[in-house]
């Protein structure tokens, strides 16, 4: 879980502010710090993007401005706590950081200490989340700079919503209603978490993107290896991150830290899985990308397996691995003479219990008599199906005592069994007491391995996600994109989420793919055409493919050539935010203003309608000005879907339109995007589909005809 603190102050520029941010990850004990300027303090896009990447469980905000505090709180939503400036003591921040830093040494963090707002954000973090109250953190935290630009693609909340990147609820994490659900073919808990992180943090480094593509390509080609890897290996890997957190706590607190023997066996089995993965991945040597597999996966796995040799010997020596395979986690009797003696006593008692059971079965003629656990009260008893109750009572003496009578079973005991059960409990109690000390020593040694457990978890989850990408590519016919900085070309691009939904619902018509082509020389594309004609789907498809490429996935096209984008901006619809006193039109303008202030030449912008909430002439003027600014001053790739046909006259714009077929005043949407400008928007035809009264439609067409004559 991550906790985040934000400290903000107004800058000398009335429209800007300076922000410091501190994040604490309680699983890795890493405190990340950064500070940055927000050039537009009405939207705070950089802060919003970082919070979406981090996905914190709790946020604390401290500001010297009520207006800024209100805006920050709006971004942080319900997870936010307000910390007063007077509550924090930044003068003590350096001393507090030294108490938490590994070895108490701050010399490695001099650059961070010079960032005033970062340090103040740390003070807010330490105050709100009581970091210094947890002595297990002392001299055990690593400080690092949190990258603001140049490491991950920046995405805002509007983009996550417009592209359906994440599932709306955890219950939909496997459904194809979101990109996460579509790609989530992961087999391990760590893989599912890693996929969520990758979707929040798309890459912007070409070499890292290509590395992921190489591995996906290799696993797609080696289908048999991938299937074994997923079904026989990764599906058995437990949540190593949780176990690592327990082990780290155990080492820091010098206790068992909540570590169970089952956890240690889980790590043991994960190492065995890593050994199997090495063998499977080495079968891909014929692939042209095997060098990448070797460098990124096989060699690191082999190093980790070697690092675990001592751990594996510890577990094999201390634990009864035969019992562990049956789901019973016990200290091996051969490890301790006292445990061996108690185990022998236990076996003798169990043999006597079996002799009593066999005697009753022989006496009653009921072979199905079993020794079972009764729940009320909890104890061991004999069990038969209910129809044998009278047979038991008639064939045995009066010493039989009923323990439990259920709908389908009868549980009973005898004085002899009761004595044996009492003896068994006594021996088991002594066994547990003796094993507790051994368990504590075992955990103490095992806890020192938590750093490499973390590395193993990271590597196995990475393999899991890349294997899921390969499986998704096989299912949905995704192709590897060629990365090119100067153009975006896709042949037969499909919106894979809509396609998946059509297949699931039995929709008869196949998804209509479209070609996408845009480059630096013609970086503005105006898309016109009727509502429901496919304009929105077309521009979302372009953005979705760009995102999929930069997380390392293949894309839904026949062929694809894509650049690496620094960010994606989506302005695709708005609604009134009455609680904030913001109208639909104002919301549109705020979003558009944020885009033109923060977009750069490497941005991808998709706009689906703009300027509808004011007069037609004013809306058109604003749409024209914003489109021209994105085209000329910023120079980014822009897809602009609109009903303002006049925007097609922007010099240098490429015009495309959604096609429709009209026959006998009925409209049929073809969902094909072709070159040129739409003849009209077909609004009255769509109104007819919506069930408008014919008289209203006729009146609308008459008024439209008269207006067009006046304009002419």
Predicted features by range, described:
Residues 1-218, 236-245, 258-351, 355:
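Charged catalytic and DNA/RNA-contacting regions of genome-maintenance
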Residues 94-95, 269-348, 376-414, 464-526, ...:
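Amphipathic heptad-repeat alpha-helical coiled-coil/stalk segments that mediate oligomerization
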Residues 115, 387-417, 466-712:
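ATPase nucleotide-binding head domains, primarily ABC-like/P-loop NTPase cores
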Residues 219-223, 244-255, 278-288, 360-363, ...:
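Secondary-structure edge/capping motif, primarily at the C-terminal ends of alpha-helices
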Residues 250-269, 694-712:
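C-terminal helical "lid" subdomain and adjoining coupling/linker elements of P-loop NTPases
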Residues 401-444, 460:
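Extended, charged coiled-coil "arm/hinge" scaffolds of SMC/Rad50-like chromosome-maintenance ATPases
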Residues 430-483:
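Charged, surface-exposed helical/loop "interaction arms" that form contiguous linear patches used
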